UniProtKB/Swiss-Prot annotation:
HAMAP family: PdxT. Its EC number is 4.3.3.6, 3.5.1.2. It comes from Salinispora arenicola (strain CNS-205). GO terms for molecular function: glutaminase activity; pyridoxal 5'-phosphate synthase (glutamine hydrolysing) activity. PANTHER family: PYRIDOXAL 5'-PHOSPHATE SYNTHASE SUBUNIT SNO (PTHR31559), PYRIDOXAL 5'-PHOSPHATE SYNTHASE SUBUNIT SNO1-RELATED (PTHR31559:SF0). Catalyzes the hydrolysis of glutamine to glutamate and ammonia as part of the biosynthesis of pyridoxal 5'-phosphate. The resulting ammonia molecule is channeled to the active site of PdxS. L-glutamine binds at G49, E50, S51, R110, I139, R140. It catalyses: aldehydo-D-ribose 5-phosphate + D-glyceraldehyde 3-phosphate + L-glutamine = pyridoxal 5'-phosphate + L-glutamate + phosphate + 3 H2O + H(+); L-glutamine + H2O = L-glutamate + NH4(+). This is Pyridoxal 5'-phosphate synthase subunit PdxT. The gene is pdxT.
Length: 201
């Protein structure tokens, strides 16, 4: 089976962790910092970090238009935490100068789960992925307030004060989670995305 070539947007955030998780899931993972590097990948991960910084650096490194075009052309993209914000068609509590790639028809609330001191772990079941719930980590994470037609809700928080909040979605070849699977050692979500990329090539 051919390894899909998956880039990790290497402007800020958990680049090394996503790269290692993708490699463990059987992908040929490589950092993407320039448009020429984006041209060489079959799929892209937008990691956690700070969404306003990622937005600004996407412009500085001249990646915004190439990424927008690849998304429009059907390239699979997975965004975790800040990456989810970068894929949202509408962002609540974002900065006025913040611009997303807007691939998924959803409204997300930035930093919905609170500041870093309010970060927490919780079990989340993700539809289509076997093996039981993920034990996931939320760090200043967004949640999804609304999804449009064609957006599949894959996971919600199952317990605690945030129970019922949407934290994993998919629309076509685009996948987004509020949480950080790259930090937990559970590679199932990266394997799921690698399969999605493999099927799209």
């Amino acid at each position: 089976m051919t390894a899909p070539v998956i880039g990790v947007l290497a402007l800020q955030g958990d680049v090394r962790e996503h790269t290692a998780a993708l490699a463990a899931a059987g992908a040929d993972a490589r950092p993407v910092r320039r448009p020429g590097e984006l041209d060489l990948v079959d799929g892209l991960v937008i990691p956690g970090g700070e969404s306003t910084t990622i937005s600004r650096l996407a412009d500085v490194f001249e990646l915004r238009e190439p990424i927008d075009k690849r998304i429009a052309d059907g390239m699979p993209v997975y965004g975790s935490c800040a990456g989810m914000i970068m894929l949202a068609s509408e962002v609540l509590d974002g900065r006025p100068d913040q611009r997303a790639f807007a691939g998924i028809e959803m409204t997300v609330r930035r930093n919905a789960f609170g500041r870093q001191v309010h970060s927490f772990e919780a079990p989340v079941s993700v539809a289509g992925i076997d093996g039981g719930p993920f034990h996931v980590l939320f760090i200043r994470a967004p949640w999804v307030e609304r999804v449009g037609q064609g957006v599949e809700v894959l996971g919600t928080v199952t317990e605690g004060p945030a129970a019922g909040r949407i934290v994993a979605v998919r629309q076509g070849n685009l996948l987004a989670t509020s949480f950080h699977p790259e930090l937990t050692g559970d590679r199932r979500l990266h394997a799921y995305f690698a399969d999605l990329v493999r099927a799209a090539v």
